[in-house]
From Swiss-Prot:
Chain residues that bind ATP: 173, 175-177
SMART domains associated with the record: AAA (SM00382), Bac_DnaA_C (SM00760)
PANTHER family: CHROMOSOMAL REPLICATION INITIATOR PROTEIN DNAA
Subcellular location(s) of the protein: Cytoplasm
Region annotation Domain I, interacts with DnaA modulators: where it falls in the sequence: 1-84
Region (Domain II): 84-128
The keyword Nucleotide-binding belongs to this UniProt entry's keyword annotation: yes
Official protein name in the record: Chromosomal replication initiator protein DnaA
Assembly notes: Oligomerizes as a right-handed, spiral filament on DNA at oriC.
GO biological process: DNA replication initiation; regulation of DNA replication
Record-annotated disulphide pairs: none
CDD domains hit by this protein: AAA (cd00009), Bac_DnaA_C (cd06571)
The species this protein was found in: Pectobacterium carotovorum subsp. carotovorum (strain PC1)
Stated family: Belongs to the DnaA family.
Amino acid sequence: MSLSLWQQCLARLHDELPATEFSMWIRPLQAELSDNTLALYAPNRFVLDWVRDKYLNNINVLLNDFCGMDAPLLRFEVGSKPLVQAISQPAQPHHKQVSAAPQQQVRSAPVRPSWDNSPAQAEHTYRSNVNPKHTFDNFVEGKSNQLARAAARQVADNPGGAYNPLFLYGGTGLGKTHLLHAVGNGIIARKPNAKVVYMHSERFVQDMVKALQNNAIEEFKRYYRSVDALLIDDIQFFANKERSQEEFFHTFNALLEGNQQIILTSDRYPKEINGVEDRLKSRFGWGLTVAIEPPELETRVAILMKKADENDIRLPGEVAFFIAKRLRSNVRELEGALNRVIANANFTGRSITIDFVREALRDLLALQEKLVTIDNIQKTVAEYYKIKVADLLSKRRSRSVARPRQMAMALAKELTNHSLPEIGDAFGGRDHTTVLHACRKIEQLREESHDIKEDFSNLIRTLSS
């Protein structure tokens, strides 16, 4: 039995699974075939449990397809073996691979940047910007952010490993910054002397400008290239800043060559960031790119309940559901609304009920209901897909019309409080089962198609802004 068996499995899994799933869970596996047993080695227990739970059946089916009655037994283990590396590593992206830094190399610790002599900077340490309050433990996981959290967790456990760089993207207030800090805290927890730097992209630009003004560009380079992990928020602000992009390009390459972790966030997919050089956007995708979507209803409720618990506030479940049903755009908006409710309750001494929330959030709820209507959804979707609203209401079944119609129905269910029959009536008198089918179809396509996933996220962001 040839060792190419696992390579055949990899090829099939690559074709069958969404690219993000394959990169996150299958690519890190290493394989060893001996004594009619195929041993799969996962980098940590988390990956092992996930693969065994989610993909065991897929792998067994492939082994049976390729080998029939001679299919090997499957065994999972945590770790790796030197002999395994060459035979089981999946194909890498088509870019020049950079070599790992020699094991004996010791990086000098980043010291206070010499280009900034302000009093505030004098107290600076290279990890002071990592917020200890943002951890994986208090990050509420749901379907919308599950992959992003799992990838971030693996990076924290194994910085500089499989997912480098890690690129997280999604709308404002969805938890990207929280995950950046959580990774930083995770790395520091495992290695207290780790050199972890978190910053907004504009700070990188400001530091570079100061370095140029003070003729200290070499110190600037040494500082940023000596970290163990560089976490940069809102990378889209590099747009049209050519000198900053040039310097970051070389910093990026140096960090990758030294197996130093890079994590970036943006409000959009890398290739959609305007004003950033193609060579940078290409590098952003070298590791793993994961979207964070607006939280679904159950996650929004869980976020509210956890936030209330952190504030020692008893929040009735029906109240959390009431708020979550009406405020859908992002986590920050949810937490802001809850803070407002809590403050009002403290000031007035009243119990938190649905009627009390209606009163405390009266203007916010009224604005939401005014902004997100079925009519508004139909107009926005029609404009997005460059069709007419009349097409959405018509009986036409061509894909160019049917898919936008399904998208609009799914958005109406997600963003309004209308029932399925009411939504159907608003779309040319369609039956509620048609609406239900549309919602399920869009949910399925969001799992299978990056384009549909992006369309849904973009439309929600537009309608919620």
